[in-house]
């Protein structure tokens, strides 16, 4: 008998969460006309930044384009992408050498600041820890004019644990 240890247990409210997200996607076009923005966010980490060591040689009559195999390494980058749910197009992209809580918060803050005419933002993401970090929760509460006690990280309130922030 096999037991999978990386697959999380089925959540009792999973179907309700999926229905909420699907409902949001269905309403996105109509609500966008009312000044709301819907974007899906995801990351691509560890992307190698490479540069060809020598320029390509162009095609010539009877010869194909030629490319040398050697390249120069410039480390790796982490990308954060926002896709507009209504249009399906790339709305924003951030490329940095790291992807941490501060990077994600700066990405969200930059996105919101870039379009001040938007009345309400809806960001759809997975539950990666940086997507539900203390700094992001505090920023969202501040931007939403929520006058509530968020509690203390690791001790009480909304900030008590990652699951209480999801």
Place the predicted regions along the sequence by residue.
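Short mixed-charge
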Residues: 142-166
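Short, solvent-exposed loop/turn segments at secondary-structure junctions
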Residues: 44-46, 85-88, 127-130
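Electropositive, glycine- and tryptophan-enriched low-complexity nucleic-acid-binding patches
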Residues: 59-119
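A short acidic (Asp/Glu
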Residues: 50-51, 132-137
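Acidic/histidine-rich, metal-coordinating catalytic segments
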Residues: 118-132, 154-158
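Charge-mixed, compositionally biased segments that are often intrinsically disordered regulatory tracts
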Residues: 1-73
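Generic enzyme active-site microenvironment
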Residues: 40, 82, 124-125
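Basic nucleic-acid-binding interfaces
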Residues: 41, 98, 121, 147-148, ...
């Amino acid at each position: 008998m096999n037991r999978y240890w990386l697959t999380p247990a089925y959540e009792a409210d999973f179907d309700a969460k999926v229905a909420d997200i699907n409902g949001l996607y269905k309403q996105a076009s109509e609500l966008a006309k009312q000044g709301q923005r819907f974007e899906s966010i995801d990351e691509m980490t560890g992307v190698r930044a490479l540069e060809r060591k020598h320029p390509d040689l162009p095609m010539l009559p009877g010869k194909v384009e030629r490319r040398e195999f050697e390249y120069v390494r410039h480390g790796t980058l982490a990308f954060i992408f926002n896709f507009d749910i209504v249009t399906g197009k790339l709305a924003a992209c951030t490329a940095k050498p790291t992807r941490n809580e501060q990077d994600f918060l700066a990405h969200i803050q930059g996105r919101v600041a870039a379009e001040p005419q938007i009345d309400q933002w809806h960001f759809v993401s997975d539950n990666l820890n940086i997507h539900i970090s203390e700094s992001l929760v505090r920023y969202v509460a501040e931007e939403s004019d929520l006058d509530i006690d968020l509690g203390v990280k690791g001790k009480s309130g909304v900030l008590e644990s990652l699951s209480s922030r999801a």
